[in-house]
Amino acid sequence: MKSNTFKEYIAPVVVLVCICLVITFALAYVNSITAPIIEQNAIETANAARAELLPAADTFTEFKDKDKLVELDPGKVFVTECYIADNGSGMVVTVKTKSFGGLLTEMVGIDNQGAITGVKVTAHGDTPGLGTKAHAPEHLQQYVGMNSYNDFSAKADPSVNHVSGATISSNGVHYGVCAALEQYKLVGGAN
């Protein structure tokens, strides 16, 4: 029996390549339809979080000077966005900090007097249970009204109660608050 090289080796490869091309184009098409919707939903979610953290604000304008975004510890504690309320009532700062499960993203609202109006963790990779206790609303509430910090570390700052057993996660949240307060000072307030 004579073997047919094309049928045995080349034809299956051609078929698989064609299938891969069809699937690739189908995924690209679906992505082109869904990407703008996903982006719009992300913008709406961020705007809702800003409104929650600074209820006195009507609308926000992004602080555009990217060279003046605070970076307390390169790659570990840095501001990614700063939005200033158009009515001068304050600002909302988005910060990424190193936490137990990787980078933690939090938003911090600061009023026009430099006091924190709220803190919200929007993304994290911390361990569910103990690690996420540092992200709980009852833990984050302790920062409301704060306008300065005594120490960069949550454990060493007497004005903050850190979560015992979740020091790295507690520090991640605290670092973000410190970076947001530094951003407020650097921008010169909310005016």
Language-model segments: which ranges?
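Flexible, solvent-exposed loop/hinge segments and secondary-structure transition points
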Residues: 2-191
